Amino acid sequence: MLQDFEICPVRHTSLIHDLYIDLRAIDTLEVNIANQNFSNYGKNDFVRDICSDDYENHIVIENDVPIAVYGISKKPINGMYCIYFLGNKILDTNLKLQKEFLKRSNAIIKEWLSTHECLFNFIHKKNNRSKRWLTSLGAVIHSDITHNGMELFTLRKGDANV
């Protein structure tokens, strides 16, 4: 059964390190593109970012294995709140975990939209699985607003299917 915790740096650092090593390939690509201005971005930088005070960050664990991290910015950027979900490569092959995490993710999005008007982030143009999930929730992929192979997506409260 998946357990969800608000990230506590002292308690979860080693699990976040482990997740960095086992990220889905597409999530690794997105993290690297988002941080390409930092030439030596690595595991310690990832942990620092995931533990940042700028976001409400959570870690999802099953049997002491990090399955995912996710979060939402505490302050809006141009009226929108930045969100992220990053998963362990085990989600690519384990259907049971996949279904459970999707169900949980949908509930998280619903919760965020109850208090935030608009959510956003950039997603890699080849991240088809996540793009399908986002569009099923009512997100709009703005393929005309791109940066380094990443496309903007927005999810507005009134358009959501959660």
Predicted region positions:
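Conserved acetyl-CoA-binding loop-helix of GNAT-fold acetyltransferases
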Residues: N94-E111, R132, S136
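A conserved beta-strand-loop-helix scaffold within acyl/acetyltransferase catalytic domains
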Residues: Y70-G79, S143-I145
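Conserved beta-strand-loop-alpha-helix junction that forms the acyl-donor binding cleft
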Residues: L113-T135, I145-H147
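Active-site rim helix/loop that mediates acceptor-substrate recognition in acyltransferases
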Residues: N35-Y55
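Conserved acetyl-CoA binding element of GNAT-fold acetyltransferases
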Residues: N78-Q98
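Helix-loop element at the rim of GNAT/NAT acetyltransferase active sites that forms part
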Residues: T13, D18-Y41
